[in-house]
């Protein structure tokens, strides 16, 4: 039997062969072929019949060198294509104009959740603004207009549930992800969120 290294230990998801800077050539070309198929299905050079963008899951698990080559391919097919990536921490390295146009902006989410969650000792308005301004300065201006500023996602609890249940500040994805897993958390309120959570949403 074959035994593969699995992505994050998931044996059903074998890891691609790669170097420090790129995916192995056969894997890279396979992904490139998929990209061409979806962006220009009939291969006539007109992308009007193809998709207009990509959202890449766990993009931080793939080398930067691959994303740079992939971006060049995508933009050669459709210069207007939108490329966004799941990056759960600071994304400066991905938003230099040679990889992605935008990211899922979890770094915006953490201070926002902490500020509005009724059961968390909220940071001051000054601290909240400092966190947001730090991000505004870190990313290129053109990226700021297309970032995905999200309050929840398919990977974590919905915002009303998080507002109801969060009791301490959250500043990084692993803690946020683990917190939203109900199993083993008898204190996690799984019924309809109470009025305090909805009041926070209305703010």
Features from the language model and the residues they span:
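Intrinsic structural disorder
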Residues: 1, 81, 192-196
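Substrate-binding/active-site clefts of carbohydrate-active enzymes
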Residues: 1-47, 70, 76, 93, ...
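The substrate-binding groove and active-site-proximal loops of carbohydrate-active enzymes
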Residues: 9-29, 51-62, 113-125, 159, ...
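Generic structural "secondary-structure junction" signal
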Residues: 15-18, 102, 106, 110, ...
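Short, hydrophobic/amphipathic alpha-helical packing segments
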Residues: 32-36, 64-67, 197-202
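Active-site-proximal helices and loops of the catalytic beta/alpha 8
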Residues: 34, 47-150, 166
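Flexible loop residues that form catalytic
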Residues: 43, 59, 88, 155, ...
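Active-site-proximal substrate-binding groove within the catalytic cores of carbohydrate-active enzymes
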Residues: 133-203
